[in-house]
Design a protein with these regions (language model features):
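Receiver (REC) domain switch/output surface
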Residues: 4-9, 13-33, 60, 163, ...
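Short acidic-hydrophobic, aromatic-tinged amphipathic segments that line or gate anion-handling sites
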Residues: 9-15, 93-96, 168-172
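Short acidic, S/G/P-rich loop/turn micro-motifs used as interaction or catalytic elements
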Residues: 17, 50-54, 99-100, 119-126, ...
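Conserved acidic segment of CheY-like receiver
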Residues: 40-52, 57-82, 92-94
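Acidic catalytic/metal-coordinating carboxylates
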Residues: 97, 125-134
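Terminal, compositionally biased segments used for targeting/anchoring and flexible tails
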Residues: 156-272
Length: 272
């Protein structure tokens, strides 16, 4: 019941030494967010008010993002570009109330790589068990395709996640962090680009890097390419690799504006 309002963040030591690095990175990300977003860097928004839980999830989240950034950096042509790739990793920002989360999303919505939110947290000064659902629903109305993940200790909240087209993670699950990494890898544009058949969702192609995309862009099935283009998946995949100029360019070449799949193939090829 102590008043902790004088502190920027309060953490709970759970024995994971990675927490120390996470604290440093979290403060760095908050301080650099305004500047880096101007250069195209993306934001991962974490909404969680439980000190114990965000002290546990942040080390896992940072470890995963940093590992992915190191892998992407190896695709760079020289040491300078490798450093730029590392610096361009997504920034992780923590919000602990509805108002704080909505303010961050509203300001940086065009640079939001994805949102991970609890279901129960403060709204208008009071704990609200539906705050997460209302937040994710509001974000979904703003952006039809931004990846959303709802996490809760109440398994029945999975129905609410489905209503706002978000993935659901059970906080009580022993494999919670395995599920979290799986969803982030699949939804946020990390890892290989897996092209899928929109009807069966079966894998039709797997591309590991930019060269693979350029080499195979004219061979990808029309329906699969259209599915991913219409959901900004290509742009998101490039963003996660800190390829901001290409990503920003392709983000504005939408299917609704062009409606020519062969022209899209050529534009992607030329942009790379």
């Amino acid at each position: 019941n102590e008043d902790l309002s004088i502190f920027e963040y309060v953490f709970c030591w759970l024995g994971n030494t990675d927490l120390l690095l996470s604290i440093i990175k979290l403060i760095e990300d908050k301080m650099n967010l305004e500047h880096d977003v101007g250069a195209g860097v993306q934001m991962i928004l974490l909404v969680e008010d439980s000190i114990r839980f965000y002290s546990s999830i942040l080390p896992n989240l940072y470890k995963f993002v940093l590992q992915q950034s190191q892998e992407f950096a190896t695709e760079a042509l020289n040491a300078q570009l490798e450093t730029l790739r590392m610096r361009g990793r997504p920034k992780i920002v923590l919000a602990r109330s509805y108002e704080e989360a909505w303010a961050l999303y509203s300001k940086y919505k065009n640079n939001t790589l994805g949102v991970i939110s609890d279901c129960r947290f403060p709204c208008e000064g009071k704990t609200d068990e539906m705050a997460g659902y209302r937040l994710l629903s509001a974000i979904r109305r703003e952006d039809q395709f931004v990846p959303l993940i709802m996490e809760s200790a109440e398994s029945d909240k999975a129905e609410l996640a489905e209503k706002c087209n978000a993935d659901f993670i059970d906080k009580n699950s022993k494999k919670m962090y395995v599920d979290l990494r799986k969803y982030i890898l699949k939804r946020f544009g990390f890892g290989d680009f897996v092209f899928r058949d929109p009807d069966t969702m079966e894998e039709v192609a797997r591309l590991r890097n930019l060269k693979d995309l350029q080499d195979n862009i004219f061979n990808l099935p029309k329906e699969s390419l259209l599915y991913h283009i219409s959901r900004n998946n290509v742009s998101r995949w490039l963003c996660s690799r800190a390829l901001f100029p290409i990503s920003e360019f392709l983000k504005h070449i939408t299917w609704h504006s062009l409606q020519d799949i062969d022209a899209h193939r050529q534009i992607i090829f030329d942009a790379i």
